[in-house]
């Protein structure tokens, strides 16, 4: 009984953050249900929610950056629509408090796992569209992403981390970085990778985690780029 009350409170808070109140609360519950908890879980919702999210953010960027090419817009969208951003957003909304997880996932801290949080966000966008319509779901996404789109740094974010680091090193006439898997934690379908990024002659090595090798490499590259730009900023050419 106490758990039910806590879940209801969590769901009320989540709806407030979404800016949308469900008429059929069972849709929200399913959106927050992991497959480890019940057969009626959120994976099919994710499929729809992912499409709603990608379209809406694409349209927001299309309108905000009229001079960007298709490739630049795609890279910019990828910097906003990814597991890291969605998990961060979910954490800000305390989505983990409203999740339904199986005993194993609950014990292993699944309510904090980025992949589970990100999936729940996508599933909720679908749930809104089922409860109302596509336009309402689009408004929810716009509400949540407006500030992130407004403050996105095009110069840095339009390129993925590895590309930006490579170009920054080449501009300074340094060798390309080397990436190496330091550790792989967990099972095949639920792994966490620890990747190192070595800048060689610069004597800097950083490590980052990700739920895939690619994601971890991108995070390590971003960390290395941040260090490089702080330690060896390029001098701006005089006009």
UniProtKB/Swiss-Prot annotation:
Keyword Protease: no
UniProt-listed CDD domains: DSRM_RNAse_III_family (cd10845), RIBOc (cd00593)
Localisation: Cytoplasm
Enzyme class: hydrolase
UniProt entry keywords in alphabetical sequence: Cytoplasm, Endonuclease, Hydrolase, Magnesium, Metal-binding, mRNA processing, Nuclease, RNA-binding, rRNA processing, rRNA-binding, tRNA processing
Keyword Magnesium annotated: yes
Residues that bind Mg(2+): 46, 119, 122
Domain RNase III: 11-133
Domain DRBM as annotated: residue spans: 160-230
Subunit structure: Homodimer.
HAMAP family to which the protein is assigned, alphabetical: RNase_III
GO biological process entries: mRNA processing; regulation of gene expression; rRNA processing; tRNA processing
EC number, as in UniProt: 3.1.26.3
SMART domains registered for this protein in UniProt: DSRM, RIBOc
GO CC terms: cytoplasm
Protein name: Ribonuclease 3
Pfam families reported for this sequence: dsrm, Ribonucleas_3_3
Active-site residues, Swiss-Prot/TrEMBL: 50, 122
């Amino acid at each position: 009984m106490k758990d039910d009350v806590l879940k209801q409170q969590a769901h009320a808070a989540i709806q407030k953050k979404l800016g949308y109140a469900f008429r059929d609360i069972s849709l929200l519950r399913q959106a927050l249900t992991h497959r480890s908890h019940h057969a009626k879980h959120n994976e099919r919702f994710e499929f729809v929610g992912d499409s709603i999210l990608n379209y809406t953010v694409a349209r927001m960027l299309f309108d905000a950056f009229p001079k960007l090419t298709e490739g630049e817009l795609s890279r910019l969208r990828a910097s906003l629509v990814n597991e890291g951003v969605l998990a961060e957003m979910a954490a800000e909304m305390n989505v983990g408090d409203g999740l339904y997880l199986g005993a194993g996932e609950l014990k292993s801290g699944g309510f904090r796992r980025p992949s589970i949080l990100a999936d729940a966000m996508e599933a909720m966008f679908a749930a809104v569209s089922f409860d109302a319509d596509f336009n309402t779901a689009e408004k929810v996404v716009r509400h949540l992403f407006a500030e992130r789109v407004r403050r996105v740094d095009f110069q840095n974010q339009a390129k993925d981390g590895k590309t930006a680091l490579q170009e920054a090193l080449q501009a300074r006439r340094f060798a390309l970085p080397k990436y190496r898997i330091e550790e792989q934690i967990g099972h095949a379908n639920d792994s966490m990778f620890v990747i190192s990024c070595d800048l060689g002659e610069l004597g800097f090595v950083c490590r980052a985690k990700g739920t895939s090798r690619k994601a971890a490499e991108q995070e390590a590259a971003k960390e290395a780029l941040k260090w490089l730009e702080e330690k060896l900023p390029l001098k701006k050419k005089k006009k």
